[in-house]
């Protein structure tokens, strides 16, 4: 998935999506590994999810195609990320104002071109790229614009099919509303894993 909302798929898991060619002004946004017969589930910045059969996506040999040709996101929405895998697999969904939850991939799949609302985002808030949660012992790491990083066990994040979620990072509502302080990154680290912060 590119920052401009273009999508493509490549066979094999040894491909580095950051090294692919992108249109001028476009670049890498998010990627996921899965199998061709699984649905690719996209989430946009307004908290809506959409599903596309992965095998129907264009090849990575070209520049791909805009997702807006297949889906009908709300005006002003951009695609934030993509998910694939086991339908029972958990994914962390987080808004940049500090709220989030985990959801089963099967609860995010929809056949509607307009998608379905899964993460309630306050006006002015945006959804961050989703992260796969492989174990309740995994660490959820969230970072804000002031350089603070918080890590806590994934088991502390509620599982729900949709909603606003719990406050994962305390951002004063006035600062969130003015976009002065926000979450800028989220990652899930497995036991024994590491995190590099840029």
Question: For each of these PLM feature ranges, what is it?
Answer:
Residues 1-198:
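Short, structured "edge-of-domain" segments at secondary-structure transitions
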């Amino acid at each position: 998935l590119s920052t401009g909302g273009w999508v493509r798929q490549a066979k094999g898991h040894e491909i580095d999506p950051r090294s692919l060619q992108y249109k001028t002004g476009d670049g890498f946004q998010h990627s996921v590994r899965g199998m061709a017969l699984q649905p690719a589930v996209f989430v946009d910045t307004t908290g809506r999810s959409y599903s596309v059969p992965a095998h129907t996506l264009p090849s990575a040999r070209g520049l791909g195609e805009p997702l807006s040709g297949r889906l009908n996101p709300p005006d002003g929405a951009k695609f934030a990320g993509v998910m694939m895998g086991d339908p029972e697999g958990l994914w962390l969904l987080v808004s940049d104002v500090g709220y989030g939850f985990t959801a089963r991939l099967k609860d995010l799949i929809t056949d509607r071109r307009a998608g379905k609302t899964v993460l309630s985002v306050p006006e002015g808030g945006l959804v961050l790229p989703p992260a796969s949660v492989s174990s309740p012992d995994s660490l959820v790491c969230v970072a804000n614009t002031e350089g603070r990083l918080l890590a806590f066990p994934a088991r502390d994040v509620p599982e729900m099919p949709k909603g606003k979620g719990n406050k994962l990072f305390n951002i004063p509502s006035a600062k969130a509303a003015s976009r002065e302080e926000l979450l800028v990154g989220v990652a899930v680290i497995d036991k024994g894993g590491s995190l590099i912060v840029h």
